[in-house]
């Protein structure tokens, strides 16, 4: 066991360094509003040698993909908490909206860039970004569909709702709210924003 301790410490340091590089890259990508940021700049801002970057990432596209994947993983964690929650459909919907808003607030500029990169097929890294965002969208659709069906069964939402159509409309509302919030220089408190969005959506779905 004693011989494994140094290896464990190395793993911690490696993970810390990798996260540090990704945090720096995400900030620079967001601040510049472009993925066209050199590995030299990222290394300098992160306080590491350029060669260190290539220990963790083969190239800039791989680094960008890792940044988006990290955003996806955190959003997926938020979604998983809602799925496993035993609360009412309305309470779970609010918790989902709140959690997603909180994740976007962690790096709004990078979220804006990711959305812009996805919509421009010629942009550097668009394929990697598009793939991760597609997975986020699919996860959201799955959870929203389950919430709508549960809400109808509980009598919280209208019985005649078409779940597929309702999910599309609700998803559009949430996506639009995220995009607007990510571009606001001084957004309202996240809990208040979640309440506003949830109230608006539930009035549309309500029985």
Which residues does each predicted region cover?
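Base-recognition residues in the alpha-helical recognition helix of bacterial helix-turn-helix
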Residues: 30, 54-58, 70
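Short hydrophobic/aromatic patch on the recognition helix
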Residues: 25, 46-57
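C-terminal peripheral helix-coil segments that are non-catalytic and often amphipathic
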Residues: 1-4, 8, 99-102, 142, ...
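Hydrophobic alpha-helical connector segments
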Residues: 66, 80-109, 163, 167-170, ...
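Amphipathic alpha-helical packing segments from all-alpha helical-bundle domains
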Residues: 73-76, 80, 125-154, 164-168
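Amphipathic alpha-helical segments used for helix-helix packing
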Residues: 104-128
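Basic, helix-initiating cap at the start of DNA-binding domains
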Residues: 1-32, 36-45, 61-65
């Amino acid at each position: 066991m004693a011989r494994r301790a140094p290896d464990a410490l190395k793993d911690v340091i490696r993970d810390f360094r990798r996260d540090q590089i990704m945090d720096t890259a995400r900030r620079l990508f967001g601040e510049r509003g472009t993925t066209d940021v050199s590995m030299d700049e990222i290394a300098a801002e992160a306080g590491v040698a350029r060669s260190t970057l290539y220990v963790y990432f083969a190239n800039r596209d791989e680094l960008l993909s890792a940044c988006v994947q990290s955003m996806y993983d955190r959003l997926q964690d938020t979604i998983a908490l809602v799925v496993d929650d035993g609360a009412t459909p309305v309470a779970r919907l609010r918790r989902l909206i709140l959690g997603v808003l909180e994740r976007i607030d962690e790096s709004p500029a990078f979220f804006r860039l990711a959305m812009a990169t996805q919509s421009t097929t010629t942009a550097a890294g668009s394929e990697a970004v598009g793939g991760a965002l597609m997975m986020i969208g699919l996860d959201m659709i799955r959870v929203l569909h389950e919430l709508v069906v549960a809400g109808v069964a509980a009598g919280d939402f209208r019985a005649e709702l078409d779940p597929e159509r309702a999910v599309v409309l609700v998803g559009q509302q949430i996506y639009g709210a995220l995009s607007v919030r990510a571009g606001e220089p001084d957004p309202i408190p996240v809990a208040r924003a979640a309440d506003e969005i949830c109230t608006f959506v539930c009035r549309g779905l309500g029985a």
